């Protein structure tokens, strides 16, 4: 299985980079992982709704450059469907069983994901109704993917 994470913004803090490296190493037993960072746009203070949409569209165009036709695209979005870890494990496993072995998870910037990306998405997933920093969320996603593979394989970890 090939898993691509396309995220807006770069990780700058060493502790976040270390966590990403650790989960990337752990996941190498289960899948080929590719993490792509696209440049984020600066959001001016008090940006209007239309300015925010323009920023999301610019970031969205950068993301689209990395999405192939054969990818099953999962957009991480507050309006998406929620599921628990075991359900997420089945979701990823079933994608692989149905021949969808190239999965792309999209993490938007601080303003969210563009409408163009949401239209392209095959599935919209919500981890929580809470908002998280997108840099931290990348680690949360990696951990859930790792947890999902452990559950799939019947290996201890998830309790």
Curated annotation (Swiss-Prot):
Top-level class of the enzyme under EC nomenclature = transferase
GO terms under cellular component: cytoplasm
Nucleus as a keyword?
Answer: no
In this record, what's one Pfam family?
SPOUT_MTase
Main location as per UniProt: cytoplasm
EC number, UniProt record: 2.1.1.177
Residues that coordinate or bind S-adenosyl-L-methionine: 76, 108, 127-132
Question: What pairs make up the disulfide bonds?
Answer: none
Describe the reaction catalysed, as an equation.
pseudouridine(1915) in 23S rRNA + S-adenosyl-L-methionine = N(3)-methylpseudouridine(1915) in 23S rRNA + S-adenosyl-L-homocysteine + H(+)
Q: Does the keyword Methyltransferase apply?
A: yes
* CDD domains assigned: RlmH-like
**Can you tell which superkingdom this protein's organism belongs to?**
Bacteria
Its localization reads: Cytoplasm
* Membrane-spanning segments: none
Summary of subunit composition and partner proteins: Homodimer.
* Family annotation (HAMAP family): 23SrRNA_methyltr_H
Family indicated by similarity: Belongs to the RNA methyltransferase RlmH family.
Which protein is depicted? Answer: Ribosomal RNA large subunit methyltransferase H
Q: Which organism is it from?
A: Clostridium kluyveri (strain ATCC 8527 / DSM 555 / NBRC 12016 / NCIMB 10680 / K1)
Q: Which gene encodes it?
A: rlmH
